[in-house]
Structure formats: C-alpha cells, structure tokens
C-alpha cells in the first residue's frame, strides 16, 4: 500500500470496529453533520458565495474544482478553510468550459474541454488518464497551499463505475484522504460493493449522503435535518451570490442563489440545525481520524 507516494505497512488498512462517530470522539448515537459546498472555483460568484457560507453561514467545508477558471481566485482567498478537491472530469455547461490539466485525449470532448455528460465520459475515458488527471488536480491544490481535507467527485462521475472507482480509492489511499460516497444507492443498483471496498482499504466516508443533484437545496436540506440519523451525515449545497456572470448561465442560477440566501442569511436553517441536535463538523475531522488509524 502507498501513502503520499511511499510504501507503508499494510496494518494501515485494518478496519476499526468502532462507529465513525466514536472514532471522531463522540458517542455511537451522536448525530454529526457535514454541510458541504460544491463547485468552489467554478465561478467568481461561487467563490464569494462559498466563502461567505463558510465564514458567515452554516457551511462547514467545501470542495475546489482545480481545473475550473476561477480556481486560482479561490486559492488567493483561502484562509485555512476546510477545503477538499472536487475531482473534475466533466464540464457540463454548454457555453462555459474547462478541461484537463494533463495531456488526456480521452478526456477531451469534441467541443473542447471535458465531456459535458457522464455517459460521454464513461464511453470514452481511459482510466489511466483519469488517474493521472485526478492525481494532478490533488497535487496542484497541495502546491497552491490548500490543506486538502477530502475528495469529492464532480457529478459523481468516478464513483459509479468500477474502473473509475478504483482510481478514486487509489488516490484516497495514496493521499490518505476521506471521500464522499452515496448512501442512497444499494450495491445492486451500483453493480458493485463500493462502500465495502472503500472501507476495506481503510478509507473513511460519511455514513449518510444523498447524491440528489436536482436544482435547489432548501427542502432537501431541511428534510435531511428533520430525519437525521445517528452517525455522520453529509448534506451538500451550491451557494453563489447573485451576479450577471452567474445569471448568464440561465435558470439554473436561481437555485444556486437561493442556496446562498438559505445557508448565509436564513434563520430557518440555523433553527433546523439546533432542533435536530446536530453536531456540525467538517471533513478535516474525518481526515485526521483516517491518518491516525
């Protein structure tokens, strides 16, 4: 097994019998919540929105899209926040594109940049090029001075196919970083035991995560808090401030702007968190526990 590019003892892979909450220093029935922000670095509006959500609102961590156009701006405004790498091999917007850091012909679409859809990616991507590209994104974030706390794939692109999931877990082990994994998909639906495979490699991940990517987070977040289960639950949002730049992408911007108002300005979220009994944490707690095992 390899960590930070160096071989380490196989005992690192031993799976603890304690619950994740217990490994984080809490009781087994504790309800811990990670409120994460996606797409830091994608837009200027996202950078301002995400940092406001972290510093003024209820969010606890975020993930950086290293190949995206505003990534360097996000880094320039970084101040030790709990930030992971949003492993990116798709570019979903028709008029706003980004592409690989590395030479990766199989990750280029006909219109330039990464493929727009997951199906297009899955049809053409070479796993070796996906591995090299994703490793480069993590390395770039570290070189920029980000204290990387976790890995979270953009659009779940490398989670739900075995050949790309292998890449995901290899990098999690190499850099000793926890990962985001959906809990609402069964092994039968995915076609392979992805959560079991990650656990067997000693990779930590939240107990609960609903990978619902439909627009708008308000009701989904409130429903998750009303029905909070013991363990670690990740809930994701995508906050952006209201600017002409983000409005130019179309109606999809409405949900991102609402996410911002909800997470930063809406007292109902703070009340829902208090009513749920949630203990708010970030991914850094999982990373530190993973590296201590």
Q: How would you name each of these model-derived features?
A:
Residues 44-69:
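A short alpha/beta connector and helix-capping loop motif
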Residues 94-122, 251-254:
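Active-site gating loops and adjacent loop-to-helix segments of metal-dependent hydrolytic enzymes
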Residues 2-34:
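N-terminal pre-catalytic segment of deacetylase/amide-hydrolase enzymes
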Residues 32-34, 59-61, 80-86, 148-152, ...:
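Structural preference for beta-strand elements that scaffold enzyme active sites
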Residues 127, 135-204, 211-219, 226:
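Catalytic domains of cell-wall/extracellular-matrix polysaccharide-remodeling enzymes
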Residues 180, 249-293:
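C-terminal domain-boundary segment and adjacent tail
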Residues 38-40, 65-69, 86-90, 154-156, ...:
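Active-site beta-loop-alpha junctions enriched in small/polar residues
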Residues 50-56, 71-84, 99-109, 143, ...:
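Acidic (Asp/Glu)-rich catalytic clusters
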């Amino acid at each position: 097994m390899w960590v930070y590019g160096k071989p380490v003892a196989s005992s690192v892979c031993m799976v603890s019998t304690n619950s994740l909450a217990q490994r984080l220093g809490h009781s087994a029935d504790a309800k811990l919540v990670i409120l994460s922000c996606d797409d830091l670095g994608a837009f200027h509006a996202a950078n301002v929105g995400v940092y406001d959500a972290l510093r003024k609102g209820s969010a606890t961590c975020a993930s950086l899209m290293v190949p995206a156009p505003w990534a360097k701006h996000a880094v320039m405004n970084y101040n030790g926040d709990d930030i992971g790498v949003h492993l990116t091999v798709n570019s979903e917007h028709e008029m706003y594109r980004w592409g690989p850091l590395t030479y990766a012909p199989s990750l280029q679409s006909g219109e330039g940049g990464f493929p727009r859809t997951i199906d297009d990616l899955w049809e053409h991507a070479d796993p070796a090029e996906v591995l090299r590209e994703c490793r480069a994104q993590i390395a770039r974030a570290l070189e920029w001075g980000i204290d990387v706390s976790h890995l979270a794939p953009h659009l779940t692109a490398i989670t739900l196919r075995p050949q790309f999931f292998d890449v995901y877990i290899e990098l999690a082990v190499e850099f000793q970083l926890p990962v985001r994994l959906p809990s609402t998909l069964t092994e039968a639906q995915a076609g392979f035991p992805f959560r079991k495979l990650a656990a067997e490699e000693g990779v930590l991940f939240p107990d609960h995560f609903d990978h619902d990517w439909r627009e708008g987070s308000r009701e989904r977040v409130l429903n998750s808090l009303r029905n909070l289960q013991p363990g670690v639950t990740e809930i994701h949002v995508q906050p952006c401030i209201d600017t002409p730049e983000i409005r130019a992408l179309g109606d999809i911007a409405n949900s991102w702007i609402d996410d911002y108002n909800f997470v930063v300005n809406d007292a109902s979220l703070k009340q829902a968190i208090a009513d749920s009994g949630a203990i708010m944490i970030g991914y850094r707690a999982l990373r530190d526990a993973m590296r201590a095992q």
